[in-house]
């Protein structure tokens, strides 16, 4: 994401991408137009998306009649540009990074929730801090305008505080972790593997994690309207394959970690740290996510996420989430 608000420095980096970069078609030149006989899907470095390679290697795509070509993006922002410019049929991206394009009227639809971050992102504090009240006036390191920024804003709001109650220190994730460990800041918003490493070292603990904000950090499969119309069979088959993938990860996590770790050049043991903090969505969880009546559905959480994006001028206009959600493919997959 070096072309976004900050540079990507490691694996598992997700950020809020501005709509203007998306509309510019960043990275478009590196991806060819999708072939008629396949569905071309962008994948970046996050467990819920790397899991697609489990589906590929275990034959779940073929089993469900889906001709899928996974396209790896080392730079997550590039994948969003490729989808927006029509060079992908679908892409792996966050709900927050989909609302910007929707506000601009791009013809995109969320068709599957792969996962929610459920502990991989955390607000880490020193051993002596036991309450949010003790954070008032303290230095908190994070990557500004990132998912980490959103996590902190949510954590403070849930505990009767505002961002102005703390002193923000804008650092890359790696630098934020180092600053926290060395005592230069009082707290830091980080993600795994730093969260688990700091806990094991005894230098800090999570006072709030993404597990405490269910539904607000969803990772999705987002498709072009045109692809939904012309390649519906493949996309429905892909959703069916996902449910087999989720079951495989749940029942055989060691084997899944072995497959996924190779994609990102890690050891299975290193990769296993990420699985507990990722809530992979099965059919039941997806059914709820696409039901607008549910409190944690995509429709219900969109205004909360959009408010954060608007406050920091990360999107222009007001996104109509109802135009960016299509649950009919999920319904077809469950028939």
Give the ranges of each region predicted by the language model.
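Conserved C-terminal helix/tail region of periplasmic/extracytoplasmic solute-binding proteins
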Residues: 303-335
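Bacterial N-terminal signal peptides that target proteins for export
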Residues: 2-20
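Secondary-structure end/capping motifs
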Residues: 229-314
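N-terminal signal peptide c-region/cleavage motif recognized by signal peptidases
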Residues: 26-32
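Solvent-exposed, polar/charged alpha-helical surfaces in well-ordered, non-transmembrane soluble domains
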Residues: 59, 81-85, 109, 133, ...
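Pocket-lining segment of extracytoplasmic ligand-binding domains
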Residues: 96-97, 169, 175-265
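Short, glycine-/small- and polar/acidic-enriched structural segments
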Residues: 38-175, 186-192, 208, 215
């Amino acid at each position: 994401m070096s072309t976004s608000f900050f540079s990507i420095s490691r694996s598992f980096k997700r950020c809020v991408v501005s709509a203007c970069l998306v509309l510019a078609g960043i990275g478009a030149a590196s991806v060819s137009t999708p072939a008629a006989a396949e569905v071309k899907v962008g994948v970046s470095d996050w467990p819920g998306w790397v899991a697609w390679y489990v589906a590929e290697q275990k034959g779940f795509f073929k089993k469900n009649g889906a001709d899928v070509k996974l396209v790896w993006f080392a730079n997550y922002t590039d994948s969003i540009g490729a989808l927006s410019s029509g060079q992908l049929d679908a892409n792996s991206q966050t709900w927050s990074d989909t609302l910007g394009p929707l506000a601009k009227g791009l013809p995109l639809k969320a068709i599957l929730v792969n996962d929610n971050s459920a502990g991989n992102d955390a607000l880490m504090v020193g051993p002596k801090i036991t309450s949010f009240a003790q954070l008032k006036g303290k230095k908190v390191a994070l990557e500004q305008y990132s998912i980490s920024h959103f996590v902190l804003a949510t954590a403070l709001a849930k505990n009767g505080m505002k961002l102005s109650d703390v002193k923000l220190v804008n650092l890359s994730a790696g630098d934020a972790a180092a600053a926290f460990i060395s005592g230069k800041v009082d707290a830091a918003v980080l993600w795994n593997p730093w969260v688990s490493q700091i806990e094991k070292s005894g230098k800090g603990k999570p006072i709030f994690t993404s597990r405490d904000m269910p539904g607000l950090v969803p990772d999705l499969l987002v498709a072009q309207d045109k692809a939904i119309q012309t390649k519906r069979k493949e996309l429905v088959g892909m959703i069916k394959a996902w449910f087999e993938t989720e079951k495989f990860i749940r029942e055989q996590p060691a084997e899944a970690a072995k497959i996924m770790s190779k994609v990102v050049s890690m050891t299975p043991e290193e990769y296993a740290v990420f699985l507990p903090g990722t809530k992979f969505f099965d059919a039941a969880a997806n059914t709820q996510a696409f039901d607008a009546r549910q409190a944690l559905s995509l429709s219900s959480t969109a205004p909360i996420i959009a408010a954060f994006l608007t406050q920091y001028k990360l999107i222009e206009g007001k996104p109509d989430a109802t135009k960016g959600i299509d649950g009919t493919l999920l319904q077809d997959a469950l028939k």
